[in-house]
Curated annotation (Swiss-Prot):
Belongs to the methyltransferase superfamily. PrmA family. The keyword Cell membrane does not apply. SUPFAM superfamilies: S-adenosyl-L-methionine-dependent methyltransferases. The gene is prmA. It catalyses: L-lysyl-[protein] + 3 S-adenosyl-L-methionine = N(6),N(6),N(6)-trimethyl-L-lysyl-[protein] + 3 S-adenosyl-L-homocysteine + 3 H(+). Disulfide bonds: none annotated. This is Ribosomal protein L11 methyltransferase. GO terms for molecular function: protein-lysine N-methyltransferase activity. One of its GO terms (cellular component) is cytoplasm. HAMAP family: Methyltr_PrmA (MF_00735). Keywords: Cytoplasm, Methyltransferase, S-adenosyl-L-methionine, Transferase. It comes from Chelativorans sp. (strain BNC1).
Length: 290
């Protein structure tokens, strides 16, 4: 289905405020949002939201959210051709080395070094090829935590391509439940699990949050990895505490540097303690224990 990009421009501070409001307003809709700097010298930023249907309704909701912010340009629209933009932009990217892992496409199969664990992930509609700072940060943290703590039952919440679930399974040879709210991502995850010969350990399921019978059957987990976004991570903190065994480890990412303290505070309030933070560009990956 073709997409419509709705966008506007302003100086940095109003743009960031607008982006935060839109992120909160459209959180339940799952619409992609983006903010980028167009002109550093003049401090001009552009905020975009992408809609596959009813873009007029989206535009009305945007205006309602943003009426009190001064200095924003009019909302403009741009029709985008029907292209798998993820595959289009990621095709041909070089392999990523993160921790013990060598994440690659089929064109670099067999090029891993001695001691590296190869994971083959093709560009697709599911997030997670290892190139993003959140994914590489999680892979690095998994490489540190798993050999030291020897978990026996793991969860990858918001699995996307299943690269993190596959990494845990290939490194530790333990059962991993990999879930995602998006059925397309779950289908891609299942294909990647088979491709990487991890089906013996990884179970996939389409589930919003912790709402699936598999959780009751598989809990408690002694390792949970969640690479989503800061706001939903904070909201999930009580459920994380219920599903993680005492002494278990939590690896969180999808968190911008300025959101780190807020996320940590949300989990400390649920009885977690912060151990380590990894920084990858503007993103952080956090290791906590219960």
């Amino acid at each position: 289905m073709p997409q419509t990009r709705l966008f506007f421009r302003s100086n940095g501070a109003p743009a960031r405020e607008a982006f935060s409001r839109l992120e909160a307003a459209f959180e339940e809709d799952g619409l992609p949002l983006a903010i980028r700097e167009l002109d550093e010298e003049r401090d001009i930023h552009e905020v975009s939201i992408y809609a596959s249907e009813d873009w007029e309704g989206v535009a009305d909701r945007m205006r309602s959210c943003l009426t009190s912010i001064a200095g924003l340009s009019e909302i403009e629209t741009e029709e985008l051709p029907e292209i798998d933009w993820v595959a289009h932009s990621l095709a041909g990217l070089k392999a990523v080395r993160a921790g013990r892992f060598f994440v690659h496409g089929s064109h670099e199969r067999g090029q891993h070094r001695a001691g590296e664990i190869p994971i083959e992930i093709e560009a697709s509609l599911a997030f997670g090829t290892g190139h993003h700072g959140t994914t590489s940060g999680c892979l690095e943290m998994i490489s540190r935590v798993v050999p030291r703590e020897h978990p026996r039952n793991a969860l990858d919440l918001g699995t996307g391509s299943a690269v993190l679930a596959i990494a845990i399974a290939r490194l530790a040879h333990i059962p991993v439940l990999a879930t995602d709210i998006d059925p397309v991502a779950v289908r891609v995850a299942r294909e990647n699990v088979r491709l990487n010969r991890a089906a013996e350990w990884v179970e996939t399921a389409a589930a919003p949050g912790f709402h699936h019978p598999a959780f009751a059957r598989r809990m408690p987990f002694d390792l949970i990895v969640a690479n989503i976004l800061a706001r939903p991570l904070i909201g999930l903190a009580p459920a994380m505490a219920r599903h993680l065994s005492p002494g278990g480890s939590l690896i969180l990412s999808g968190i911008l540097t300025h959101q780190r303290r807020q996320v940590i505070a949300g989990y400390v309030g649920q009885g977690f303690r912060h151990l380590t933070t990894l920084h990858r560009e503007e993103w952080v990956t956090i290791h906590m224990k219960r």
